[in-house]
């Protein structure tokens, strides 16, 4: 499934809850957390309390060295029962293909991101296409919790994303 929303809508809080519930329901279940960049994977580990988050490249064995271990690892299905990938909007078609081809039957996948932020550098807008295809369950978080109720930052960001140039001004 997909969880999407603007900054401050609670994506990280939802992830923490998913992990907590999953651990209670499936105490022996294998969980893998990944993100496209080292910074995003570290932030994911810190915010969820799950210290095994890693980059997609590392998790898929797509290291810079072309050694036998990486080649073998690239062909094996991921052993996880639950795979959560944060910042999926940054994933291009090549990396998405590598990722999806490694999912074992029965694994649960949660893709998280904001399609209006950090698009992939490579070809393809995979996250947006998955959201729009109507084949994958999508949860859109649209209430902003990070800013105060009087803040106009979130409103203006939404207006800009919609192409609206009439912005509101206030104390922040």
Label the predicted regions.
Residues 31-81:
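Inter-Walker segment of RecA-like/P-loop motor cores
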Residues 3:
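Hydrophobic anchor at the beta1->P-loop junction of P-loop NTPases
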Residues 87, 113:
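Walker B catalytic acidic pair
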Residues 21-30:
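Post-Walker A helix-loop "phosphate-sensing" segment adjacent to the P-loop in P-loop NTPases
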Residues 7, 88:
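The conserved Walker
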Residues 115-172:
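Conserved helicase motor core of P-loop NTPases
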Residues 11:
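Conserved lysine of the Walker
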Residues 14, 18:
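Hydrophobic positions on the alpha1 helix immediately C-terminal to the Walker A/P-loop
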